[in-house]
Amino acid sequence: MSGHSNYPEWIYVAVVIALMAWVGAEAWDAERLVEHIPEGAEVIKVTAQQWFWTFEHEDGTKEIGELHVEVGKAYKFEIMSKDVIHSFNIHDYVVLMDAVPGRVNTVWFAPTDVGEHDIQCREYCGLIHYNMRGTLYVEESST
């Protein structure tokens, strides 16, 4: 075949490879951000059980159904369940992690705005699942 050029095919292959490299780099960067828990993040133990949440701060303070945190500070949640599978969700901050009996799962977040936010269970956990809610109170820093 005289006069046939492979130039368009090579351009197409190069563009596809460049796009794949770009998507891979973006995905790696996003995963690194999600998995990297900032140093100094306060640990809060989150325990799910039918049909409420309990929260325990590093200083031993315990809260049931509501969680008080400070704006601009990083928090690491250690999430567990006492009975069945639940799913810890703070929709406004895109926090979502399963609470599994016998296992501790971790997720972190740093609240950016003062206010109230819903905490809910996103995994069907029994008859009163619809009522397994809590409230996150993001408050001004006390220091």
Regions found by a protein language model. Give the residues of each.
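Extracellular/periplasmic metallocenter environments
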Residues: A99-T143
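Beta-strand-rich interaction surfaces with strong enrichment in secreted/lumenal proteins
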Residues: I64-L67, V94-D98, W108
